[in-house]
Design a protein with these regions (language model features):
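C-terminal accessory subdomain/extension
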Residues: 112-227
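Active-site loop/helix belt of alpha/beta enzymes
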Residues: 1-106, 110-115
């Protein structure tokens, strides 16, 4: 990539491109996720000025968020990335954009616990009532953030249940006291679902959706549907 001074030099010394097969002029928006950020308009103006020195050459500027700002940012090619996975790009209305990633795990054990018992490493969660606690076979080694302990929720059948205690390396615990017992076997648990999507889990983990996806390790099996 070139900074502004280098681009100016190149414009004045086009002979430096002799022998190169240049196919596209490309740049990348730094703040496309924020629709009213003035940087977007400034970058577009600078990009158009650069394009004017290379007439006829195709151009590409917009990532997922940039492609939703306005057609002015589209040019000959857009470069959607996270939108292909249904990731919501910042504060931009997404219309028909829908999440395509679901993350499931299984219940390994269900046990009863007494009011006052503590759950997980460090005993950070103390039960306020007699409870049913399920141990789920996923942990931070699978990419499930430790920040989600005591914050996140999972879906079991048609009912949600809170994650309680610390997230461990290979497991975590969920309070299933209010979940219909019929849903606990075979015990499929949805960690990402329509009611708790990437934007929600990222918010609870105090990170961004991109990090949630890229931290999914090799242990979770991938199943590609309707591909």
């Amino acid at each position: 990539g070139l900074d502004a001074d280098q681009a100016d030099w190149l414009i004045q010394n086009k002979a430096a491109l002799d022998g190169l097969d240049c196919r596209y002029i490309m740049s990348h928006l730094s703040s496309a996720e924020v629709t009213d950020d003035p940087t977007n308009v400034a970058q577009l103006a600078a990009f158009n000025e650069l394009r004017s020195w290379f007439p006829g050459m195709p151009a590409s500027l917009a990532n997922s968020a940039g492609s939703m700002l306005s057609p002015d940012f589209h040019f000959q090619m857009t470069r959607p990335g996270s939108a292909l996975y249904g990731v919501h790009p910042g504060d931009i209305p997404t219309g028909k954009l829908a999440p395509v990633v679901r993350w499931q795990a299984r219940i390994m054990q269900v046990r009863r616990a007494k009011a006052g018992d503590r759950v997980g490493y460090g005993g950070t969660h103390q039960l306020g009532r007699d409870s049913t606690i399920a141990t789920i076979g996923v942990g931070y080694a699978d990419g499930y953030s430790r920040m989600l302990g005591g914050k996140a929720q999972v879906l079991i059948g048609s009912q949600t249940a809170p994650v309680v205690g610390e997230v461990s390396m290979d497991s975590m615990t969920v309070d299933v006291t209010d979940v219909d017992a019929a849903h606990l076997r075979p015990g499929t648990v949805e960690l990402l679902h329509d009611g708790y999507d990437l934007s929600h889990i990222a918010g609870d983990a105090e990170t961004i959706s991109y990090e949630i996806l890229t931290k999914l390790g090799t242990r979770p099996k991938r199943h590609y549907l309707n591909s």
